[in-house]
Each structure stands twice: as C-alpha cells, then as structure tokens.
Amino acid sequence: MNNGDSNRETDSTTRSDQSNLRESPTRSPSSEQCSMVATTSRKREWAYGGRGTMASLAKESQENFQYMAEELEKMGNQFFGYVTGQSVKPSSAYISDVIILRDIQLRDQCLDVLREYGRSRRNGLFGFSEEGDHIHVIHDCSYTNRSCRDIWLGQVKPFGTVQKTGKPVKYIWEFKRTDWYDVFIYFFIRKRGERAIYIRGESGKIPSNDECVRWAREFKEREMVSSSDCTDYYECEQQEHKISRRSDAGSTNGRLYEKKTYSAGKFAYIRQKTKALLRKYYVSPISAICDVPEFRDDDLLCDPKNRDYIQAACEDFGKDLNAMSLREIYNLLTEDYNFTDDKELNPYAQFISSMKYDNLEGSLNIVNELLKYQCNDDEDLIVEFLTNLVNVLDRRIPKLNAFLIISPPSGGKNFFFDMIFGLLLSYGQLGQANRHNLFAFQEAPNKRVLLWNEPNYESSLTDTIKMMFGGDPYTVRVKNRMDAHVKRTPVIILTNNTVPFMYELAFSDRIIQYKWNAAPFLKDYELKPHPMTFFLLLSKYNITF
C-alpha cells in the first residue's frame, strides 16, 4: 500500500520545511505561508505534511493522525470493522484492478454488473469506484495458485479490459490499519464518481459527497495518498508536472492517460443491431434471435468471436423489458400503428416463436370465450380477474406478488398464460424445489415474470417462497456461478393439485388464487392466441394498464 520512496522524500521535505519555519520566526510570512500557519495547529501541521500516507502522518503528528483516524472510522466503520476483524482470512490476498471501458456509454451497464455481483458475493469484501472512462475494483480473494478466478472478470469483458495495478499482490496479514486507511481514502473519499462497498453481499456505508467535500476542506486532502494503486498506463492523479515533462520530451500526446482507449465501434454496432432485431422479431426466448435468418445472414453477428457481445446485448434487451410496465411494453410494440387492424402486424413485433399464433380476431374470440366459461359468464368476475392479474404483473400492490390458478388438466391455464409470457418475453421457469435439485430457482434473476408450473417444494424453503411471493429481495443458487440476487419479480403459479402455500395463513396476503374447471372445447383449437390479444382483452373490459 505505502510507496516507500515517496514517503522518504516527503518526510525529508517536511522536516526541511519545519526547520525553516522554526529558524525564521520573525520573517514576514507570504500569503501561502500564512495559510499554512493560520488557525489550529492541526491544520498548520497538515498543510505542510506533504504527499504522505497515514503511517507517515502518524510519525509527523499524532494529534493530526488521531483526529483524521477518528473521522475515517466514522465514515467507514463497516469497512474497517471487516478488514481488521476476526472473520477476514489473513491468508486471503488483497486484489486491486482497473476496468478500462471501451466506451464511456458502457459505464452504467458495467456498474450494474458490478453491483449485481457485489450483492451476490456471499463472503468477503468487494468494492468499486468509478472515474469516468475507467473503474477501480478491489476485493479480497483466496488467490489459489497465485491467480484470481472471480467470475466478475468474465462478466465485464463486453464492456472493457481489466488491467492489474502492476504492484505485487499483498496478503491481508501484511496490512496494518494505517494501510487500510490509505485504501479507503484513495478509493472511497478521493473518488467522486459512483462508489460502492459490499461485505458478504450486504451494501456497506461509503462517505457521502458532503463528507468528501468536508474532508477535503478540513484537511486540504488533495495529495494525501499516492497513486500507487493505478496501472502504469492509467494513473488517476492530475499531476501537471507529469504532463509538462512528457511535453518537454517531445511527446505528441500530452494527455495524462496514455493508453489508447477503444471506441465503442464493434460492440456498439453489435448491440444496436441485435436489439433492433429483437424489437423487430420479438423472439421467445430472447436467445432464439440467433436462429432468425436476418441474424444468420450478418457475418459479424454470426462470428463466434462475438458470442459474448451477443449475449451481453440480449441480456441488456431483457433488462430493458424487466423495467417496463405493461403500458410501456404496449407502446414499444405499437409505435405509430393501430394493432387492432388484423390485416398486418407491427413490423417491430413479428412474435417469432416455436408455436403458431392465431390472428387477432380469432385469438380474442377464443380467449374471451375461455374467460366467460371459467367466470360463469359473469362480466364482473372477468373484470376482477383481469384487474388482479394486471396488479400483480405491474407490481402495484405491496406484498402481493403471486397469481395462482388451480384446475384439472385441460383447463386452459397454459393456453391463456402462454399469451402473456410471449408478450413479456423475459420470463423464467421455477423447478421442483427438493433436496435433489439445489438450483430450482436459478432462472429467477433478471426476469420480467416467473412461471411455476406444478410447484413442489420442501418445508425448509418456505421462508424463501414467502419472500418470493411477497416481492421481497432474495438470493438463489445458480449452477457454476455465485449466488444471484433477485429483485421483485411477479410469479404465475399453475397447478392441478393443492399446494401447502395455498392454505397457509402466512401466504394469504401474498397470493391471489382462482379455481378453473376443465375446458374440453379447447381441444378443437390448434393455434395459440396471439400475445397482443391480451391488450385487446384489457381494452375490451376497460382495464387500466
């Protein structure tokens, strides 16, 4: 953490300055000297404390050090509590990396990936600080075989390259508390972009912008910690003498960041083209866009080397849908087009899937007939059914996040809801949650809606299912990956049999239940209802969405 050469130079400079001040007490001070000797001794000593570390500051002034240490402990009590506590493994390594973004427009997506990973990391420390076109990442690591294999390294590949700091890896046992002070100051006080700390998956406290400004004002903290955590090409200190030195040497590039950054170019094109095709064909599942002829005719999109870019673009499109309400999805699919005209479909919504859809008129007739049959031809019951369904799908009611239909086989449950899954597109299926299936819920993260068909679960998972049906955040196991965080995602449950959560009191406010009957007349229909029929149905019964 500490730069020994820098510290020695700073210490000698400091002693020289102190000697000069003591030997010339009667000299008329300049305005700069006045600013150094004004007010309290704490500020006076710090002003000429130079470009040191907390360890060197402790040697210069215990009073100054103690005051600053107290302030740091207040701002980063969770951080220091972990790195100096009993739960951290001394044999773990401290790793510091820099993500150099290919384009600044990719920054927010990269930060989302890092936040998601931080929340899913169930052990250790993970933190990042963003500075425009690059992002610093720190974490502790088992460092097996002297290498880091954390999965976030692969997750950020579509957004840029990861560079090491160039400094030898240090282990936790080598750090003193003053070293951790330097780390915290450098990454979470001096940096003013997006910052985050995660400790065992929980978000930790970081200094607010006001606290950072107060820190800088109180301690003149512009050059406190060395830039030793930066890469050789990616130094973050705005040091004018370095720029001028390069210019004096005849360099044609006077910029501080000498490493040439990549333009968005290739990835930007792939992302834009892939998302445009997804809007045009609206395939289900999203990954099936690779089977569309227009996609396969594009040499760049079909290049195996670009597989990671394609996957990132598909995930990004899915996340776009996850954040949309039903109204926003309706607007996406009906831009400048009245889809009630069944002679043609919106060119941005061709709904390619493995099944064949009926036309809009035929779809509306059969779906309406099914609802009348299941609701005993009672229009009020149909309105209630559709209203409750929209409330769940749009997350309108707190703690109400599940919609269940129980019926004998051939009741039309899947016939009806396939229409909705084709509309929302980004959906996941939950499996049978028992001791033989540890990854039953691995499709839950980053989805617009979840389907649980014929649910079955062990009692040990009751609390997790309560959180799922109540819209609370929870984590799930994912095969060959870290545990994943799941935000509120509506759950559709279709079953032929009674399940414990249908009658347990704890679930009564978390789930809406309907009982349907067998619908034998559906066997005469070979085609599935068109997804856009759902919006026609809502309009027919004046349901607000």
UniProtKB/Swiss-Prot annotation:
State the EC number(s). 3.1.21.-, 3.6.4.12
Entry's cofactor comment? The endonuclease active site can probably bind other divalent cations.
- Entry keywords, A to Z: ATP-binding, Covalent protein-DNA linkage, DNA replication, DNA-binding, Endonuclease, Helicase, Host nucleus, Hydrolase, Magnesium, Metal-binding, Nuclease, Nucleotide-binding, Transcription, Transcription regulation, Viral DNA replication, Viral genome packaging, Viral release from host cell
Basic and acidic residues compositional bias: what residue ranges? Answer: 1-14
User: Compositional bias (Polar residues) at which positions?
Assistant: 15-39
Q: Where is this region: Disordered?
A: 1-39
Q: Which residues form the SF3 helicase domain?
A: 346-545
Q: Which PROSITE patterns match?
A: PV_NS1_NUC, SF3_HELICASE_1
GO cellular component, as recorded: host cell nucleus
**Ranges of residues in domain PV NS1-Nuc:** 12-277
Q: Name one GO biological process term.
A: viral DNA genome replication
Query: What are the names of the required cofactors?
Result: Mg(2+)
Q: Where is this motif: RCR-2?
A: 134-136
Location comes to: Host nucleus
Superkingdom per UniProt: Viruses
Which family would the database say this protein is a member of? Belongs to the parvoviruses initiator protein NS1 family.
Q: What does this protein do?
A: Multifunctional protein which displays endonuclease and helicase activities required for initiating and directing viral DNA replication. Also plays a role in viral packaging and transactivation of several promoters. Binds site-specifically to 2-3 approximate tandem copies within the origins of replication (Ori), unwinds this hairpin region and nicks one DNA strand thereby initiating the rolling circle replication (RCR).
Q: What is known of its domains?
A: In the N-terminus, the endonuclease region is involved in binding to the origin of replication. In the middle, there are the ATPase and helicase activities. The C-terminus probably contains a transactivation domain.
This protein is called what?
A: Initiator protein NS1
Write the lineage as a comma-separated list. Viruses, Monodnaviria, Shotokuvirae, Cossaviricota, Quintoviricetes
